[in-house]
Amino acid sequence: MFINIEPLYSSMVENIKERVSKLSKPPKLVAVTCQPDSSTLAYLRSQEKQAKRFGIDFAVYEAPKAMDLKILLPKLSADGSVNGIFLTHPLPSDISEYEAVSLISPDKDIEGRHPINLGNILYDKPVFPPCTAEAVLRIINYLTNPSGKKIAVIGRSVTVGKPLAMLLLQKGIDATVTICHSRTKDIAEITKNSDIVVVAIGKAKMFGKDYFKPGTIVIDVGINVEGDEIVGDVDPSVSEICELTPVPGGVGRITTLVLMEHTVKAAEMSLK
């Protein structure tokens, strides 16, 4: 069956609204875009809509060149009126993601991509984990107690696979985690021996029913374009034997709320 995340989604919405109402002024979220394509512009419109829904001020700044980023990001980080900053892709070719995200103050890095924020996860002290990784953790905690569960994470990206594995290993969560990737042999053997499988590999419908035992919780992080459709990394037929998050309408919806939550948290932290 497809997993119904609506109760989790609704509770997060109410939590954000309540926290914003207690602030003396609206939080401010800033997006920095470099060379936006049509999908980036659509993403920005979506984030602006969500921000306005919660009473969060939203602004977009353009930095077409690497030098523009090197000037703008430290300036925004030092601006007391700005609470959260996120950076869109694609980046200019002459600056790496590591270098770019390192220009954002860690306490305004609401996407959780700064090396300090990623490092905090290793010490079981996450402040702003990467939004998608946190969204997956929220969904897992909503569905079950992960303590002692065998969880396979398919994908090793710096924003999903790696940080999610570390979050699942935290004391108090205590999952047993296996990370798989493109060079992993016999992935099906691992996934069939897992209680929960998180798929974040970026290949449309790559994982079918032959990868899972009945009753497995399957979290599909993938977002792929196939013709006129948005599809995940997992074939929808898997829902016939497993609990599967839908694509679209699953992890992505929670990820957006985590971004807004982080913005509110940054505003709350700035008042302390």
From Swiss-Prot:
Keyword flag Transit peptide: no
Superkingdom of this protein's organism: Bacteria
Binding annotation for NADP(+): G155, R156, S157, S182, I223
Pfam family, any one: THF_DHG_CYH_C
Alphabetical GO biological process terms: L-histidine biosynthetic process; methionine biosynthetic process; purine nucleotide biosynthetic process; tetrahydrofolate interconversion
Xref: InterPro entries: Aminoacid_DH-like_N_sf (IPR046346), NAD(P)-bd_dom_sf (IPR036291), THF_DH/CycHdrlase (IPR000672), THF_DH/CycHdrlase_cat_dom (IPR020630), THF_DH/CycHdrlase_NAD-bd_dom (IPR020631)
Presence of the UniProt keyword NADP in the record: yes
Gene Ontology MF annotations: methenyltetrahydrofolate cyclohydrolase activity; methylenetetrahydrofolate dehydrogenase (NADP+) activity
Pathway membership, UniProt: One-carbon metabolism; tetrahydrofolate interconversion
GO cellular component: cytosol
Record's keyword terms, sorted: Amino-acid biosynthesis, Histidine biosynthesis, Hydrolase, Methionine biosynthesis, Multifunctional enzyme, NADP, One-carbon metabolism, Oxidoreductase, Purine biosynthesis
EC numbers for this chain: 1.5.1.5, 3.5.4.9
Catalysis performed (reactions): (6R)-5,10-methylene-5,6,7,8-tetrahydrofolate + NADP(+) = (6R)-5,10-methenyltetrahydrofolate + NADPH; (6R)-5,10-methenyltetrahydrofolate + H2O = (6R)-10-formyltetrahydrofolate + H(+)
Function summary: Catalyzes the oxidation of 5,10-methylenetetrahydrofolate to 5,10-methenyltetrahydrofolate and then the hydrolysis of 5,10-methenyltetrahydrofolate to 10-formyltetrahydrofolate.
Quaternary structure and partners: Homodimer.
Family of this protein: Belongs to the tetrahydrofolate dehydrogenase/cyclohydrolase family.
Protein name: Bifunctional protein FolD
Gene: folD
